[in-house]
């Protein structure tokens, strides 16, 4: 009432109406995304305003691309997207977990319980679940020689939730090998050193790992070689063309001879830089060696002519992000001047060749020694397939990186959620005094949304599945769900593992957002940018 006195145009939802609006919004977003969860999840088709179509089952992509107007749903979506930004996965799980927490809370609130009591129970349950997670995790030793098999299992688990089984299994080796390629002991893993390049060509199963680099342009001279072996590679950021001064300078001449002399001097300056590169080539190259110049700046036609005459391959306008990758892949160093070129500045590659696809040219730099950068070359018959594979590969790379940094994994297939629920009900609930027990119970039951949704998406009976899993856990057996037949399965033997950091972030963020939403007792649309114009 007081808000309406201050602003007659304000829209206000009070107490139970506000609470039920937030709960319904959370449940609505949950219903949209829950069918995507797991290997048996379905695909959503997003149609844009201009008619463009996007096919995806990646929760992060859906939440970013969808137009969400409800404020509660926007808040949940931002939390889920932040989950992906931090840990690389768990977007869909976050949304359905928050939705289930709200759904479980609604039952208690409808029976007269105050939301504050539930929030207190959520906080107790969250702390207990995080402590249980630390005891439940499986340590993985990540020294100089990493356990490649466990990394493959984690990557396979992630990729199978995004792609069909055959392609996911093929990409598993590619993803693991690419992360191990760029990994340096005692240093953080920089996934930007893995170039993800795509070619609209052939089929998705033709996707491969290139231990080197693929540049999305070719040489600009018809006489340059299209294939060369045993290549010395000069990575440089030097202008091999006439360019204007960076300061606002002008030149004046009084006759044509002076102008001609000035043009000749400018040309001579560029030619001298090119000749220094040619001198280095003659110094280091034997009869069977070749020389490649990859320049971030331009190379003009006369300079290309000089290089081509000496059998040098010249690539210009290389992207800035590829300069660091080239040095890591091929060795040597990127130079900003040709004045003091030495053989130590050069990298090496066993094979450099150009591939032409339609009007596009690609240059492959392969057979490098000890690469610390690589390229995942994604192929597919159409843009929809390529976009799906890209999303999956990015999630796969993050899952492998997380495993190496966490040095532990968590049993998947819903095993952790069922075990945590049993722990909360059988151990933690007894230690809680008063009505906060109901908050702990609601939190415990909300954890079951993951195995329930996995079973539902696989076409299984959810009640039978949950009863079967909980009875096994009561016997002391840690089991997950076999999506093929609905029977309990040992995730460790089946090789189904989740990331520890993803689970931890999920348990941390879910109850916090749910608690904030439960404590909303008024929704007021009266902000300055929302106010309706008055006459």
Curated annotation (Swiss-Prot):
What's an example of a GO molecular-function annotation for this chain? ATP binding
Pfam family membership, one: Cpn60_TCP1
What is the protein's given name?
A: T-complex protein 1 subunit zeta 2
The record's annotation in InterPro entries points to: Chap_CCT_zeta, Chaperone_TCP-1, Chaperonin_TCP-1_CS, Cpn60/GroEL/TCP-1, GroEL-like_apical_dom_sf, GROEL-like_equatorial_sf, TCP-1-like_intermed_sf, TCP-1_chaperonin
Ranges in a coiled coil: none
What UniProt keywords are attached to this protein's entry? ATP-binding, Chaperone, Cytoplasm, Nucleotide-binding
Compartments, as annotated in UniProt: Cytoplasm
Question: Would the keyword Metal-binding turn up in this protein's UniProt record?
Answer: no
Similarity comment: family membership: Belongs to the TCP-1 chaperonin family.
């Amino acid at each position: 009432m007081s808000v309406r006195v201050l602003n007659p145009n304000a829209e206000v939802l009070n107490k139970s109406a506000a609470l039920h609006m937030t709960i319904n919004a959370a449940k609505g977003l949950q219903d949209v995304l829950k069918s995507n969860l797991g290997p048996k999840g379905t695909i959503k088709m997003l149609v844009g305003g201009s008619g463009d179509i996007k096919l995806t089952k990646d929760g992060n992509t859906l939440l970013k691309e969808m137009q969400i107007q409800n404020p509660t749903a926007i808040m949940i979506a931002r939390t889920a997207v932040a989950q992906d930004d931090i840990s690389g996965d768990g977007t869909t799980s976050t949304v359905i977990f928050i939705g289930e927490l709200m759904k479980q809370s609604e039952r208690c609130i409808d029976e007269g319980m105050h939301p504050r009591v539930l929030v207190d129970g959520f906080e107790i349950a969250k702390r207990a679940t995080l402590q249980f997670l630390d005891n439940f995790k499986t340590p993985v030793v990540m020294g100089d020689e990493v356990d490649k098999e466990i990394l493959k299992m984690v990557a396979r688990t992630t990729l199978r939730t995004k792609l069909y089984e055959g392609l996911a299994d093929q990409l598993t080796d590619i993803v693991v090998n690419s992360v191990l390629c760029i990994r340096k002991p005692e240093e953080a893993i920089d996934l930007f050193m893995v170039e993800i390049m795509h070619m609209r060509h052939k089929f998705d199963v033709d996707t491969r790992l290139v231990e080197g680099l693929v540049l999305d342009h070719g040489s600009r001279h018809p006489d340059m070689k299209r294939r060369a072996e045993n290549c010395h590679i000069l990575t440089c950021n030097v202008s091999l063309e006439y360019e204007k001064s960076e300061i606002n300078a002008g030149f004046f001449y009084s006759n044509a001879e002076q102008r001609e002399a000035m043009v000749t001097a400018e040309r001579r300056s560029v030619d001298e830089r090119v000749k220094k590169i040619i001198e280095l080539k003659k110094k280091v190259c034997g009869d069977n060696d070749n020389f490649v110049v990859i320049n971030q700046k331009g190379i003009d036609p006369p300079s290309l002519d000089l290089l081509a005459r000496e059998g040098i391959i010249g690539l210009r306008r290389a992207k800035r992000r590829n300069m660091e990758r080239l040095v890591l892949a091929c060795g040597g160093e990127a130079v900003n001047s040709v004045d003091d070129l030495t053989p130590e500045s050069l990298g090496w590659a066993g094979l450099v060749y150009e591939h032409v696809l339609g009007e596009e040219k690609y240059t492959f730099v392969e057979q490098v020694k000890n690469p610390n950068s690589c390229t995942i070359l994604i192929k597919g018959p159409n843009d929809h397939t390529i976009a799906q594979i890209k999303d999956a590969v990015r999630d796969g790379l993050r899952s492998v990186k997380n495993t190496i940094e966490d040095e532990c994994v968590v049993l998947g297939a819903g095993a952790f959620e069922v075990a945590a629920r049993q722990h909360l009900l059988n151990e933690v609930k007894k230690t809680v005094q008063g009505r906060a027990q109901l908050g702990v119970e609601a939190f415990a039951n909300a954890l079951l949304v993951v195995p329930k949704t996995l079973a539902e998406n696989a076409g299984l009976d959810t009640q039978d599945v949950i009863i079967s899993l909980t009875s096994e856990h009561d016997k002391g057996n840690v089991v997950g769900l076999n999506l093929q037949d609905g029977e309990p399965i040992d995730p460790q033997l089946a090789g189904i593992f989740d990331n520890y950091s993803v689970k931890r972030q999920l348990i941390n963020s879910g109850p916090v957002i749910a608690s904030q939403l439960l404590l909303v007792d008024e929704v007021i649309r009266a902000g300055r940018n929302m106010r309706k114009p008055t006459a």
